[in-house]
Amino acid sequence: MEPGLWLLLGLTVTSAAGLVPCPQSGDSGRASVSQGPPEAGSERGCEETVAGPGERIVSPTVALPAQPESAGQERAPGRSGKQEDKGLPAHHRPRRCTCFTYKDKECVYYCHLDIIWINTPEQTVPYGLSNYRESLRGKRSLGPVPESSQPSPWTRLRCTCMGADDKACAHFCARTRDVTSYSGRAERPAAEEMRETGGPRQRLMSRTDKAHRP
């Protein structure tokens, strides 16, 4: 009677765990293994736990799949997937020059973004930003541009070039500063103009008033 109870208990535990009985040759007891399909080239070990005299329950050990080598490697910061696959370094835009003030938008575009502005008779606008509001420029000189890139001693530079051999950058920093200063002098506040023109008008009106007085 006692072996039958142990057998019933083993079958109950086996059915609850989702295992089917599997007889072992040369063993008086009974064992159970999982219903999973056999994997080619892989061996499963069994851990035996004694359930009673003359009987044992076999529980299979699950073999974890091997992880690929690339999963454990961390990507270098600042690189995209395509650049990492091709082995290309990250692109960094070199700065051509340094502006003395960031309010000078033309200098910022030229030095940091390397964008050449479009010179129009009315104003100077950066390429692709037509709605940019910039102060009106003065009259452009129709004479030939001097070929010498060395600035004169009395010319105030608006930027400093990173490379000493960059003649185009040196010419830009020396040439456009005069245009900017000219446009700054040409554009005066409205209040200042009213003060300058208001005096003579008031004196003229006062003289005419005296002439019309009886």
UniProtKB/Swiss-Prot annotation:
Keywords: Cleavage on pair of basic residues, Disulfide bond, Secreted, Signal, Vasoactive, Vasoconstrictor. GO terms for cellular component: extracellular space. It is found in: Secreted. GO terms for biological process: axon extension; axon guidance; cell population proliferation; cell surface receptor signaling pathway; establishment of localization in cell; intracellular calcium ion homeostasis; intracellular magnesium ion homeostasis; melanocyte differentiation. Disulfide bonds join C97-C111, C99-C107. Residues 24-91, 183-214 are annotated as: Disordered. Belongs to the endothelin/sarafotoxin family. PANTHER family: ENDOTHELIN, ENDOTHELIN-3. This is Endothelin-3. It comes from Mus musculus (Mouse).
